[in-house]
Amino acid sequence: MLLRPNSGNTLKYGCLLTKRWLTTSKLLYSVEDMKIKIGQEQYRKALEERIDKIPIENYRNFSIVAHVDHGKSTLSDRLLEMTGVIKPGSKSQVLDKLDVERERGITVKAQTVSMFYNDGKQDYLLHLVDTPGHVDFRAEVSRSYASCGGALLLVDASQGVQAQTVANFYLAYSMGLKLIPIINKIDLDSANIPGAREQIETTFELDPNECIPVSAKTGLNVEQIIPSVIKNIPSPVCDVNKPLRALLVDSWHDPYVGVVMLVHIVDGRMKKGMKILSAHTNRTYDVKEVGIMYPDRTPTSFIKAGQVAYIIPGMKNPREALVGDTFYQMGKHEGLEPLPGFEEPKPMVFVGAFPADGKEFNAMDDQMQNLVLNDRSVTLEQKTSNALGLGWRLGFLGSLHASVFKERLEKEYGAKIILTAPTVPYKIIYKNGEEKIVTNPDDFPDNQKHHDVESYMEPYVEAIMTVPNEYVGNVMTLCLNNRGEQKEIEYLTTGQVLLKYEIPTSQLVEDFFGKLKGCTKGYASLDYEEAGYRKSDIVKMQLCVNGEPQDALTTVIHRSQAQARGKEYVTRFKKFLSYQLLKVPISLKIIQKVVARETIKAKRKDVTQRLHAADISRYKKLLERQKEGKKQMKLSGRVTIKNDAYQAFLRRED
């Protein structure tokens, strides 16, 4: 019979020699092998049989908590090889579906993969939920963690605990996940296993004896992980006999089938043809397909409580897929409560976006809309700039989110785009008690008294940084220069220092991480979380050319930085403007007061070059006419600024 599992798994010299999976004899097969051997339909039925026979008590849903480059994707690949989901060496970074994820080494969209495991006595169904680690995608992470019972806490043996490890640990711990510490990269010469154990004990208060030292690259000791997952991580709290309740973990748009949703089935069953109801939009959908990720979409006739699986709901508008939404079976939803965790995404970074060539607006608008369909956390609205023409105002979860969006737009559609400097949402408190959130610098008041403003508030973040001992002074100076306030400092083993600062979000989005890397020679790591609003002395800063404000370059800044920043702005922008026939002043205004100014001298045409030296009256007449012409030009003329100048300035080119 197809469902007989193999009894063992052998590792030799760190290389995987055999794999657990479905087998007809002692010879083992991977997913691809079995599809070819027995045919798609028989394979699907065998898969459903196996899932149906596994009790919920034998389900394990888990994630991997790790800092970037600590080996999360490699470890995932080894686990998939161990359980026969993929052939050894056949794929790498299976769970990173997007090109930008593979290139940057980060996870942007939540993914899952199902695995079968047999310990020689009984079958287990495992769901590995791969989540974004960066704070920009933290809302998606919390939904993904809600579908898990535990997580592997991955620490690099050579680098130790890093900022993102700490931030993600606290999020997982706060949600009650059981954590299993894994020390990775023990095959490196620089590996310090005792130091990593000590850090795990002192930083996370976890038992160092529970740490599993592994090498995800070679496969050494990886076979110890799944038995530990089964032993330590609890099965999901679900009931297959209750009415359907499914939590939406993530969604994406497929050009062939439309919206695909990743869901955690908390109660009941879902099958093809079922009519489901959204708890938050009250819309109904006919389920076109259900299945598991194994590792790609594998259709099944049903999915049941405890599973993390995909559905194709026949949804026409992808923006109706709200992460954290609850779905019921139509007609069996009376008295059911939505699952906790729904929250509308709140953009924290806003940019203006304009096509490099204004003629491309219509084509790029379609491309922009298509990309936004894949990421509901992006807000999009059209806007017009007197400097750059038609464009959009985009809202993102953070600066990394904005950078990833721009990169995907350029790589997937070949679009060339100009992004203005990032801004954050400021809060204005009026004297009558009203509050207003401003996300566009153009809408920020020019004069506090004139607009009856009581005070301004700006958002802050708590930044968590890990740096080597020798660079602590440099980092403290950087934080001080960016208006940071120190909250905590902790000296870790392995020569690392953990710093916590509260920093204005506006300073963070101005390439703070790049500066941090620069002052530590690339050895620092950073993570952060929102820390609320604080009262602040912030002002609107307008760059004017020939007296006309350039709205694409308007920004909001703290008053203490205005003078220096203003001088830098006008000096740098002057470099990108060509000479005109009249004198052009470039000024920086704050509350209608000029705080910095540069002037581009006028081109001078020698109108007297063909005159005879003795013709004085003619000489004076031509000069007078030229002078009068310049007066008229000054009254009616406008300075033409090419898009290249804005692009170079916003890219901070010299």
UniProtKB/Swiss-Prot annotation:
It catalyses: GTP + H2O = GDP + phosphate + H(+). Residues 57-237 form the tr-type G domain. SUPFAM superfamilies: EF-G C-terminal domain-like (SSF54980), P-loop containing nucleoside triphosphate hydrolases (SSF52540), Translation proteins (SSF50447). One of its GO terms (molecular function) is mitochondrial ribosome binding. It is a peripheral membrane protein. One of its GO terms (cellular component) is mitochondrial matrix. CDD domains: EF4_II, EF4_III, LepA, lepA_C. Its main location: mitochondrion. GTP binds at residues 66-73, 130-134, 184-187. This is Translation factor GUF1, mitochondrial. It comes from Candida albicans (strain WO-1).
